[in-house]
């Protein structure tokens, strides 16, 4: 058997991982500006954490979860999304306690797992970035969180991103709309896909979210959720729209958007862009005021979003956005002869401790091959170290661009390498 990675997974190799690190650093730095702190939860959870919160009728639970019984016969699932684990942690660790500052803002970056058909930007193990804000029902929280996503795309230079917006209202509004949707769809039940027929009585809003052609056709003239919002729900949505207008963030009201998870209420949103004439959602989220109490905590308003790193990097690539990845080293040490091996090790360590990036030859190659490696590594400076340099405790260093050379004592190199770089015009 040829040993290979499982279908739907990937190896992120050196070089490619530098792009990931750059994007992740941009994300972390931006989230700090909005006062979000990182949370890290387990990669696997009890099955009920996901099934009960995400929704028993969702595709995630019915088709896509990786779940198993462990040796203690506990029903376990690899996490398919990040919000439910964070809410579980919020309740379990009593972060709702009065001594914890509100709103509580957290973000995560990590692997998620769904059994899906692998395609560009969608894998069975994928990496998700998410933010969760607990304790504020102010519409400004909705807008600030959406604006943070918008801010991220601006920082990365991503173009042609459209914000789609909708409201699911409060539970009373949603229930009234649910019944209206059942009344509309029941007479045309036979025209729906098999999945949507099954969902019609369990969760008819799922039909709006279906990608099946027959379902899309069936809901074209379906009633709009916005016609069923009560006064408080309408006021919340109006405030969100007004604040987005004030921040000059354009949006499209999309009444067929319901999101793929059952725990949302009030504001929901997606950021969508086009790749090769195909629409691609790159960030999505909304308000979920009932989820904390569902996990046994107190009534707590909450808002958040998730975005896929694979999709984000795919879009950056397709839009031709080059990331400023640093791929240089400060010094390459060419080592000539076994006598210089220990000295090269000693000098390299001393320079690294001063905060510089150093590589050296380990393979005893000819000098020409070593110089070629220095060029491959984009070394700013080359040091050529042999037995005579070891004896004299002095060595020549060369600026790899200007070819300027200086001769410096080992002592100076080990104590003040920055002054050596200045002598070379660096």
Swiss-Prot record:
One Gene Ontology MF term? histidine-tRNA ligase activity
Under the heading CDD domains, the entry gives: HisRS-like_core, HisRS_anticodon
Identify the domain of life: Bacteria
Return the protein name. Answer: Histidine--tRNA ligase
The entry's family comment says: Belongs to the class-II aminoacyl-tRNA synthetase family.
Q: Can you supply one Gene Ontology CC term for this chain's record?
A: cytoplasm
This protein's assembly is summarised as:
Homodimer.
Cite the Gene3D superfamilies for this sequence. Anticodon-binding domain (3.40.50.800), Bira Bifunctional Protein, Domain 2 (3.30.930.10)
> Which regions span the lipid bilayer?
none
Catalytic reactions of this protein: tRNA(His) + L-histidine + ATP = L-histidyl-tRNA(His) + AMP + diphosphate + H(+)
What's the source species for this entry? Answer: Streptococcus agalactiae serotype V (strain ATCC BAA-611 / 2603 V/R)
* Origin organism lineage: Bacteria, Bacillati, Bacillota, Bacilli, Lactobacillales
Q: What is its EC number?
A: 6.1.1.21
Q: What is one Pfam family matched by this protein?
A: HGTP_anticodon
């Amino acid at each position: 058997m040829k040993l290979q990675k499982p279908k739907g997974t990937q190896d992120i190799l050196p070089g490619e991982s530098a792009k990931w690190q750059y994007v992740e650093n941009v994300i972390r730095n931006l989230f700090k500006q909005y006062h979000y702190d990182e949370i890290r939860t387990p990669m696997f959870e009890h099955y009920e954490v996901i099934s009960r919160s995400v929704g028993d009728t969702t595709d995630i639970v019915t088709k896509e979860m990786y779940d198993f019984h462990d040796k203690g016969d506990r029903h376990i699932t690899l996490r398919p999304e990040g919000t439910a684990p964070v809410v579980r942690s919020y309740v379990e660790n009593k972060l709702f306690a009065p001594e914890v500052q509100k709103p509580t803002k957290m973000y995560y970056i990590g692997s998620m797992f769904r059994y899906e058909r692998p395609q560009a930007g969608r894998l069975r193990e994928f990496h998700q970035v998410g933010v969760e804000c607990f304790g504020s029902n102010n519409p400004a929280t909705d807008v600030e969180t959406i604006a943070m996503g918008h801010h991220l795309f601006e920082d990365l230079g991503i173009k042609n991103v459209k914000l789609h917006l909708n409201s699911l209202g409060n539970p009373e509004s949603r229930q009234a709309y649910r019944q209206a949707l059942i009344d509309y769809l029941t007479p045309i039940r036979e025209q729906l896909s098999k999945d949507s027929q099954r969902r019609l009585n369990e969760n008819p809003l799922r039909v709006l979210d279906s990608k099946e052609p027959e379902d899309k056709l069936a809901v074209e003239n379906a009633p709009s959720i916005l016609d069923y919002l009560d006064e408080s729900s309408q006021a919340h949505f109006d405030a969100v729209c007004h604040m987005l207008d004030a921040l000059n963030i354009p949006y499209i009201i999309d009444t067929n958007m319901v999101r793929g998870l059952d725990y949302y209420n009030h504001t929901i949103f997606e950021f969508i862009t086009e790749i090769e004439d195909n629409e691609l959602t790159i960030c999505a989220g909304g308000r979920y005021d009932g989820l904390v109490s569902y996990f046994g905590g107190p009534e707590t308003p909450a808002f958040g979003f998730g975005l896929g790193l694979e999709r984000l990097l795919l879009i950056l690539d397709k839009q031709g956005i080059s990331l400023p990845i640093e791929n240089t080293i400060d010094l390459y040490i060419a080592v000539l002869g076994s006598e210089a091996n220990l000295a090269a090790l000693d000098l390299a360590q001393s320079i690294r401790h001063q905060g510089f990036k150093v590589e050296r030859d380990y393979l005893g190659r000819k000098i020409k091959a070593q110089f070629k490696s220095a060029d491959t590594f984009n070394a700013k400076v080359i040091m050529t170290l042999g037995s005579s340099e070891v004896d004299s405790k002095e060595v020549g260093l060369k600026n790899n661009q200007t070819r300027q050379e200086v001769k410096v004592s080992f002592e100076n190199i080990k104590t003040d390498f920055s002054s050596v770089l200045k002598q070379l015009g660096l």
